């Protein structure tokens, strides 16, 4: 097992580091650690890269971020990525009183359900953590007539970074901070302060109008 004591840096914050990773990728030496969103706040974890390298990681920051570099040397490098998530997407109409009111009401509804939410411009994203019919029933009546809805596969970090909004969930943990092994589920209890410049690619599953169901 390769031990990782802290993060080297983040490729989206450091152009020189990003350039080094591109060089490793071109040479076939870049390894990826794909995490579930729930793993990002663990202080210690044991994972395997897509190349099969076993890593024992001690995290030296509040949470892992997409683009964090776990190790970098002449022979190889490893970077953190997150699994994609399916989201219920609401495209709101042009800004106006109706749109603002709808966005506020959608935020309240999502918060009441303790779901995550992210907002980019006039688009609202809610990860599919419940039955799709339930999500549509809870949110549908608060979507303006000129708004549209769809489902899309999005980068999970969308719900972690600066676009994410509080969901009302208490993210505190009950575990004591002693004797944690790499595999134990110990989460940092910190606010999110994550900013990166990569795009969130949306692979649309289907489109539908929010008023198409009863």
UniProtKB/Swiss-Prot annotation:
It comes from the Archaea. Its main location: cytoplasm. Residues 168-214 have a biased composition (Basic and acidic residues). Keywords: Chaperone, Cytoplasm, Nickel, Nickel insertion. It is found in: Cytoplasm. GO terms for cellular component: cytoplasm. The keyword Transmembrane does not apply. GO terms for biological process: protein folding. One of its GO terms (molecular function) is nickel cation binding. Residues 163-214 are annotated as: Disordered. Involved in urease metallocenter assembly. Binds nickel. Probably functions as a nickel donor during metallocenter assembly. Belongs to the UreE family. This is Urease accessory protein UreE. The gene is ureE.
